[in-house]
Amino acid sequence: XVAFETVPVDLMKGEHKQPAYLALQPFGTVPAVVDGDYXLLSAVLDVYEAHLHGYLAGDFVSLADLAHLPFTDYLV
């Protein structure tokens, strides 16, 4: 269990484009993960990238395989 603090950012008010937030997250996107003086932007993006490409070529199941699953009942 890691202690953390959630700070809400009001996107409708443009709080993610304010200089204070841009100092934490230069792209002005959400989320921004900060641990002391260390911003974890690259680590968060790496996890996101891994989730996006979890079933591409080279893995046990590919996206093409998943796309054909709804039609397998017609083959049986």
Curated annotation (Swiss-Prot):
UniProt keyword Membrane present: no
S-S pairs: none
Catalysed reaction equations from the record: RX + glutathione = an S-substituted glutathione + a halide anion + H(+)
Keywords, sorted A to Z: Cytoplasm, Transferase
SUPFAM superfamilies hit by this protein: GST C-terminal domain-like, Thioredoxin-like
Residue span, GST N-terminal domain: 1-40
A Pfam family annotated for this UniProt entry: GST_N
InterPro entries, A to Z: Glutathione-S-Trfase_C-like, Glutathione-S-Trfase_C_sf, Glutathione_S-Trfase_N, GST_C, Thioredoxin-like_sf
Gene Ontology BP, a term: glutathione metabolic process
Entry's transmembrane regions: none
Family according to the record: Belongs to the GST superfamily. Theta family.
Protein name per the record: Glutathione S-transferase
